[in-house]
From Swiss-Prot:
GO terms for molecular function: 4 iron, 4 sulfur cluster binding; metal ion binding; oxidoreductase activity, acting on the aldehyde or oxo group of donors, iron-sulfur protein as acceptor. Its cofactor is [4Fe-4S] cluster. Gene3D superfamilies: 3.30.70.20. InterPro entries: 4Fe4S_Fe-S-bd, 4Fe4S_Fe_S_CS, PorD_KorD, Pyruvate_synthase_PorD. Keywords: 4Fe-4S, Electron transport, Iron, Iron-sulfur, Metal-binding, Repeat, Transport. This is Pyruvate synthase subunit PorD. Pfam families: Fer4_21. Residues 32-60, 61-91 form the 4Fe-4S ferredoxin-type domain.
């Protein structure tokens, strides 16, 4: 049995306006950060389907990256990726990049 892509999965329930979550950014408490290795990505969009915070940036069914303002670092995206295209890295590795 092969996995279906996001376009082949029947529509279930969709919350298109998830409360007031967009009003509240994650802040500085995220411990792990997802990193996309685009060369491995097959744009199956499982990450987009499973992300509880709508932090996956996609355009026309193509994975573009992450909205780190809302990503909690839970790792669901990395866990569901069939090609291991998403790696979870410690947030401390990025402190010098952000000042």
């Amino acid at each position: 049995m092969s996995l279906k892509s996001w376009k082949e999965i029947p529509i279930g329930g969709v919350i298109d306006k998830p409360g007031t979550a967009r009003e509240y950014k994650t802040g500085a408490w995220r411990v792990m950060r997802p990193i996309l290795h685009k060369e491995k990505c097959i744009d199956c969009m499982f990450c987009w389907l499973y992300c509880p915070d709508q932090a996956i940036i996609q355009e026309g069914g193509i994975m573009k990256g992450f909205n780190y303002d809302y990503c909690k670092g839970c790792g669901l995206c990395a866990n569901v990726c069939p090609k291991q295209a998403i790696e979870m890295r410690p947030e401390t590795e990025f402190l010098s990049e952000e000042g």
